[in-house]
Amino acid sequence: SLNTKNDFMRF
């Protein structure tokens, strides 16, 4: 996504 950190949180 636009934010990698946000992606990690999703996983």
From Swiss-Prot:
The keyword Secreted applies. It is found in: Secreted. The keyword Secreted applies. GO terms for biological process: neuropeptide signaling pathway. Its main location: secreted. Keywords: Amidation, Neuropeptide, Secreted. The modification Phenylalanine amide is found at F11. Disulfide bonds: none annotated. Belongs to the FARP (FMRFamide related peptide) family. This is FMRFamide-11. It comes from Sarcophaga bullata (Grey flesh fly).
